[in-house]
Every structure is written in structure tokens, then in C-alpha cells.
Amino acid sequence: MKIKNFIYFLIYFIFLFKVINGQNKTCKISVLLSGDKSDLGYNYMMNEARVLAESQLHMYPFSIYYEHLEESTLEAEHAIQDSVDKGANLIVVSSVIHFSLGVKYATKYKDEPIYWIIRGSKLVPTLPKVVILNFNSFELHYLLGYYAGLATKTGVVGFVSPGIGINTLSCDNSFYIGAKYARSNITFLDIHTGSWYNPEVSYKAAQKLIENGADVIGMSQDDMSVQKAIMDSGGLGLGVTGYPGHYQFGSDVAYSYLTNWTNLFITYANHVINDDWPAFDSFFTNLSRKDAIFMDDFSFRVPIDIQTKTKIELENLMNTSYAPYKSDPILESIGLQFSGNWINDTQFRANTKILPSYGDSTVDYPESLKIGVTVVSGFCIFLCLISMIIVIKFKEAKVIKSSSPIFCLLILFGCIVIFVGCIMFARSPTDGSCRSRVWLLSLGYTIFLGNLMVKNWRIWLLFDNPKLKKRAITNWKLYPWVSGIVIIDIVILSIWQALGDIVAESRTGIDSLTKYEYRNVCASSDQGSIALYLLLVFHGLILLVACFISFKIKVVDIEEFNESKPITTSVYIITFCLFIVIPIMVSSPTVTTQTTIICICALITTMLSIILLFGTKFFKMITVGLELGQTFVTSTKSSSHSQRTKSSKSSNGSGPKINGFGGNVLNLDDDSDEISSEKEKKKPIESNPKDHMAVFTSDEETSKASKFSSEQFSREQINDNIILENNNDNEEKQKDEEEIKEEKLLVSEIQAKRLSLEQNGQTEIDSNDV
């Protein structure tokens, strides 16, 4: 019996303790506001809920609030920490821009008796003391857009929003779809302010839309500044902040949605007091629930027929299965995918693209920049096309043939791509142009420098050949190298595009613009910037290799093949401009200046390179002549020739000196009989050890020539033209002279084939131990 009484007493004591403890437990609310508490908008309604909840629950100590927290993340962090220090145990993070910050501090104090209401769109499964606050703002903007489509007299409606980086564009698109449902031929203008709360900028943004014909304007700003602009112009405003606009503006506000967060605050404050907080909860509301969001009455200035049609659409929205703002097929045009009858909710909320047929009131690049770059680039493209025609028409000319016509055409094609990229750089930025202009410039320079580098790499290999090894380096053997360089460039560009999130976005406060002016600029993520720097390193390596090859071909003693000077000059100019462009990209000056310098550098480097590489060749064709089918003569002694001469002397001992080709031409083209005069045919062919000779033939002869050995190459032709100075009857001396003559033929043939048939890429050097 005593034990039973003791148990009853214990239970009673625990109950009494809990009751007393519950009566002593209090709730202290702290509200974080993004803007001004008196903005007569979203922040006003949130602060009003705090005041009413405090009054109805007789809260003591009093609740607290912090405002203007959008201006500084540090201020927002200080506000949360200060709330904790002052004993707040229900902290309301009212703005979606502070969602991550709220989660951070909720995680930090998850073991403390502190509860959170955070505005956001997704639950946090690791934080049971956090309630996510959200409401369907898309249906509200759709309904107001529907009214706007009915009410507009100009057929033009507008929308003002913070823009990408602050919020998605789903509200903008919902307003537009609503207007389109009411009036199919609607014109939609959209403008971004870069902030939830900046009354001065918002007012001027609305004025710009009005100047472009908009007479009804929606918005997702936290204050009524946009609607003030439309009312000041004589139009009817919309209540788009949750505040009853007619309280202040009377009948000038045509239609409004209203919010009341008092019940939300009271409900969760009671959970704190009663210690029965619902873990992992969320508070999502919409028009159909009628617990926090409502539609206000129409102004008497709104025609009855418009009121009636809008009310019918409101009744349709009460059915949650009706959601045209995320089921219209036009949403597929911006890459959103349907999941059943609707767009996937996650994609819809995260969308950052505006629907087609919209306008932006922005400050564009100067027309002088656009026209100047376009005209100069167009002229340069014309010169490149003319140069390509000349190369094709006179590909048999000595100076063109020595430069590999096919690679000359590829180099000119790369230059054309660069000039097209310059034109794209001077255009108004869009998502497509932001990507394409970098692709065009990068691929253009890769094609230009890659072909130039590979073409001269072949020259280096052929002339840096002291042992006269047989080397057949055709164009088909060079194409994979060029393709490999281009593929590397494409891979880096693909990584940049995949990771960079490259988009065109509107920005304020740049290029010395006033706070009322906006400009579209290209933007990318940090990963995109890293890939872009990797691309610059890749092009820097190409320039270094090109410099190295141009240095190595300085030893080439045939003028037509030695392009070291123009290549070195071109590479120097490009490198110099690159060292100008990189600091500009890092320091980020005004966008207009940046674009201008990049275009000028690209135009100058490319045009000067064309003049250096092709202008000199065309000038020589005019002054010297085409020299069709002629061989290439040098009057300098190369290192490989010196070694061959020494080898010849050591094998011949003190034998007679070999007289060779001199400056005469050995022409193996199809038209050799027509080009060479009879006198030249009968002239003995002499060989001078100081001279080298090269010959180019047609494509057919290229394939045929490779089948013959050097001994069959021109033995009969040379034997018929050699005049022996001494004809000794002594059989032994005659035998020695025959051996010397044979040695002479071998040396001459090797020299004659020092360079071979490059028109079709066939290059062959026969190796004979002379």
C-alpha cells in the first residue's frame, strides 16, 4: 500500500513539475528582414505578423527584428548571432536570399533549444528544429499577368524582377504566360534590377518599361516603387507585395494579392511554448488553402467584364490540378522538360531563362564599336577570300608551291574564323553569342597557328637531315597532327562550356553606367574561369612551339622555304597582344573597353600575320614572275651539304673536282619542254657544291617518281649533257673517269631531290653512301 501511494505521489509530482515548467517557458521571436519594415510590402507584412503574434500571445520578453539585411551578408550573420545572444528561441529568416545562412546557423545550434522558420523551397533532413516556409508565388503572378493581358491598351506588358543571381525567372515567365492566355498577341518586356529592395532603381526601371509602351507592369520586388511609377504615369497599379495597396493608394491599385503571416507565427510560437515542435515540418501555402494568401477586391475603375474574366480564372486556379504557368508547351522552348502534364517542379523553380518574344531595356555596346569591328572584319574576310583564290589559281607558281598550297588555304580559313569571332564579340551578348565568340576565336587561332606550325615542322625535318635519310612526309601524314591540335582545343572548350554555366545576364553599376542603366554581359562560374585560363595556357604552348620551329628553320638556305622571319614576327605580335589581353581579363575593366581591346588585338595580329605570310609571296609573284615549274636554288652552304662534301672528298681522295649544276634549272614538270628553250636543253648541266636544287612535279609524277630509285632518276638526261674535258686513250684512266662520273651523278641526284614533291605532300630524299 505504501509503495502504491509512493508511485501516485511521484506521478503527481512529475505532472506538477511539468505544468509549472510549461507555464514558465516563453517564446522570444526574432525576425530577419531583407528590406525596410515600413516598405508597405513583403517586409512590412512579416514585421506586422511579429507584432500581432507578440500582442495576442502576451509575449515577454519582447520580440526583436533586424532590417536591411540584403545589403550585407556580414550584417545578416551578425543579426542571427545577436538574436541567439539575446535569448531568441524562434528565429524567422524571412528572405529566400538568406536560406543558406539560416541553415548554416541552424546547424551550428542544432543541439540548443532554438527553433527556426526559414523561407526556402526544400526541406533540410538533418535539422528537425527547422520549418521551411514557402508559398506558390507563381500562381499569384500568373493571375496578375492574366489581368494585365485583359487590361492593357497598348498590347505591351512589363515585369521588373531582381534577375539571375538573386532569383530565378519563374515568376517573370508565369506573369508572361498569364498575359498570353488573356491576349495571344501580347508583347512582353522584362527588366532586372539586381536587388529585391532598391526603390530608386525599381522606379527608374518601371519608367523605362513605360517608355517602351508597357501600360501594366508586374514585379517581384519587395516594395511598391514599380507600381508608383505606373500610377504616376496615369495607369493602374498592381498590389504585388502582399500589402493591401488600396489602404495607401486607394482606387489607383487595380488588383492585389494579400498575405497574412500572423497565424503562422502564432502556431509555431505555441509549439515552442508547449514543447511539441513538429520535426522536419514545412509550411507551404497557396490560394486554395486560404490560410495565408488571399486576393483583394477590384478597384471600381476596373471594367466589369475584366473583373468577371479574372474571377473565373481565379476559380480555375483553386483547383490545384490547373497550373497553366507550368504546363504551357512554350516552356519547352527554353529547355524545360515535362514530367507528365507539367514541367518538372525542380526545373521550373530553378529556371534562369526568359521565354521568347521578350524585350530588355538595356544599354547596348556603342554603335561605333559594332560598325567599326564589323566593317574591318568584313574587309579582312574579303582579303582572305581573294588570297585563297590566288593560292588556288597559282598553286603551281614557285613561291606558292614551296609553301604547301593546302596548308596556306587552311591558314587563311583559320583567319576567316577569327574575323567572324571578332564580329560576334562586338554583338550584344546572348547565351549563344557568349559561347560562340570564344569558340570561334579559339578555334580560329588553333587552325591558323596549328597549320602554320605543322607546315614548317615538315620543312625543319627535311632540311635538318645531315645523313640524307629517306623521308617521305606527305600531307596525309601531317593532317592527323593538325587534327590532334584542334581536338585538344575542342575538348578544353567543351569543358569550359559544360562547367562554366555561360549565360548573358543584365547588370547594373558597370561601365560607368548610372544606377538607372543596365547592360547585358557574359558571365560564367568559377569553374568556367579556370577552364578559360587553361585555354590560354594551351594557346601559349602553341605559340612557344611555333617560335621554336621558326628558329630551327633559320638554317634553311632556300629562300622560298625559309619563313622564319614572317613567322617569328607574327608570333611575336600575337604574344605581345596576349600579354595585353590576359591582364585585361583578370583586372576586369569596363566591359566596353575589354571588348574593344580584344577585338582590336585579334584584328591587328591576324591581319598583320596575313600580310607578312602572304603579302611578300604575292609581291614576289608580281615582281619576279610566277616561275612555273622551276626548281629552287640556293647560294649558301647548309650544314648537311658541308657534311656531304666532306664525305665525297674523303671517298674520292685527290680525284678530279666535280663540276655540277650551277644556277641552271633542272625541270621535271610536264611542261618542261615548253618552258625550257632549245638553247637551255643543249647547255651542259654543271654542279656547284655551293648550290642546292629542288624540284616540284604534278600529282601524277609525284606518285610515279617515288617508284624510281635515284640512279634511274635522270641518269640518261645528265649523261647526254655532260661534256668531258679530257678524253684519254688510256683504258685505266678512262675507267677512273667513269667511276668519278658515276659518283658525280649520285651527288647531283641527291641534291636535286633535296626537296621533293610538296604539292601533294610527297617528300622523298634518297640516301646513298657517296
Swiss-Prot record:
Q: Which residues form a coiled coil?
A: 715-760
Q: Where is the signal peptide?
A: 1-22
Q: Where in the cell is it found?
A: Membrane
| Cytoplasmic topological intervals | 392-405, 464-483, 550-565, 616-770
Q: Which GO BP annotation is one of this protein's?
A: G protein-coupled receptor signaling pathway
Q: Which organism is it from?
A: Dictyostelium discoideum (Social amoeba)
- Biased composition annotated in UniProt, kind: Basic and acidic residues: 676-693, 730-740
Question: A GO molecular function for this record?
Answer: G protein-coupled receptor activity
What CDD domains does the record tag this protein with? 7tmC_GABA-B-like (cd15047)
Span-the-membrane segments of this chain are 371-391, 406-426, 443-463, 484-504, 529-549, 566-586, 595-615
Q: What is this protein called?
A: Metabotropic glutamate receptor-like protein F
Q: What is the lineage of its organism?
A: Eukaryota, Amoebozoa, Evosea, Eumycetozoa, Dictyostelia
Keywords on this record? Answer: Coiled coil, G-protein coupled receptor, Glycoprotein, Membrane, Receptor, Signal, Transducer, Transmembrane, Transmembrane helix
